[in-house]
Amino acid sequence: MSNKMTGLVKWFNPEKGFGFITPKDGSKDVFVHFSAIQSNDFKTLTENQEVEFGIENGPKGPAAVHVVAL
C-alpha cells in the first residue's frame, strides 16, 4: 500500500518529531514521523511544504513513509 502521492504538510513539531500531511487527493490526513523523512540534513518539515510520500499501516494506523520534499 505504498503508492507515491503528494500532499502539503499540515503541521510538524520538530521538537517532538512528528506531524501530519494533507494528501492532495482529498483523503484523510496522514501521520508523519521524522524517521520517514528522506534527507541528509536535519529531518524536519515546514507547514504548507509540498512533499511526496507513500503510506503504510503502522501500529497506530496509516503513516507516511519515504517522505521527500518537492
From Swiss-Prot:
GO CC term, one of those recorded: cytosol
PROSITE patterns, alphabetically?
A: CSD_1, CSD_2
Domain (CSD): residue spans on this chain = 7-67
Q: Which SMART domains match?
A: CSP
List the SUPFAM superfamilies hit by this protein, alphabetically.
Nucleic acid-binding proteins
Record-level Gene Ontology MF annotations: DNA binding; nucleic acid binding
Q: Where in the cell is it found?
A: Cytoplasm
Mainly resides where? cytoplasm
Pfam families attached here? CSD (PF00313)
Q: Which biological process, per GO, is one annotated for this protein?
A: regulation of gene expression
| UniProt keyword list | Activator, Cytoplasm, DNA-binding, Transcription, Transcription regulation
Under the heading InterPro entries, the entry gives: Cold_shock_CspA, Cold_shock_domain, CSD, CSD_CS, CSP_DNA-bd, NA-bd_OB-fold
Protein name listed in UniProt: Cold shock-like protein CspI
| Gene encoding the protein | cspI
